[in-house]
């Protein structure tokens, strides 16, 4: 078993980061995620948003893994459960693979919280528990997988910044459109007053 952990600070408020986290896929930084299906989403009586999603991924595999399972590329599935608590301002996301569970399990947990000293920033804490089963080189493979997870975490943070930029651009476009909609009737009204 291998445990991987990481912490990252986003220079954006918690509300922005959690909105982006829910819209992270698809993104150009991690094209291996080829589909996201929402299986269930509801708000509980305490106001927490619960989501259960299925992520479809397609990976090119290292040669040692290809020889073990006999495939060069494979589609895998990951189930993801998240809970957003708007009152405590936390988002916890847990994911686990549901493909190849007889060979490997990857259990990941991400937590998003406002930065304790700066409410305009958000702290992301990530941890993954990796277990390769039934192979004599399991420790080596777990290390390889931890390196892959670390690389993907960096891509994930880049993807979050990409989504945040995209959301901010959409908000600015809507605001500009709204300003234009307001100006047109006001200009027409002003023209009537001038007559």
UniProtKB/Swiss-Prot annotation:
Belongs to the slowmo family. Signal peptide: none annotated. It comes from the Eukaryota. This is PRELI domain containing protein 3B. GO terms for cellular component: mitochondrial intermembrane space. One of its GO terms (molecular function) is phosphatidic acid transfer activity. The modification Phosphoserine is found at residues 46, 51. It comes from Rattus norvegicus. Keywords: Phosphoprotein. Coiled coil: none annotated. Pfam families: PRELI. PANTHER family: MSF1/PX19 RELATED. Residues 1-172 form the PRELI/MSF1 domain. The keyword tRNA-binding does not apply.
């Amino acid at each position: 078993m291998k445990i991987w952990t990481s912490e990252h600070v986003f220079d954006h408020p918690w509300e922005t980061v959690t909105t982006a986290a829910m819209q992270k896929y698809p993104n150009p930084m991690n094209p291996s995620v080829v589909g996201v299906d929402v299986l269930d989403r509801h708000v509980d009586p305490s106001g927490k948003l619960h989501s259960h999603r299925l992520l479809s991924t397609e990976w090119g595999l290292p040669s040692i893994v290809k020889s073990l399972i006999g495939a060069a590329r494979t589609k895998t599935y990951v189930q993801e459960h998240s809970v957003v608590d708007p009152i405590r301002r936390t988002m916890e996301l847990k994911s686990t693979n549901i493909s190849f569970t007889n060979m490997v399990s990857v259990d990941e947990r991400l937590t998003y919280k406002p930065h304790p000293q700066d409410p305009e920033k958000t702290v992301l804490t990530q941890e993954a528990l990796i277990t390769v089963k039934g192979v004599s080189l399991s420790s080596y493979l777990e290390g390889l997988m931890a390196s892959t997870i670390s690389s993907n975490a960096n891509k994930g943070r880049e993807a979050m910044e990409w989504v945040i930029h995209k959301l901010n651009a959409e908000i600015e476009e809507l605001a500009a459109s709204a300003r234009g909609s307001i100006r047109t009737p006001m200009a027409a009204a002003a023209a009537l007053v001038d007559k």
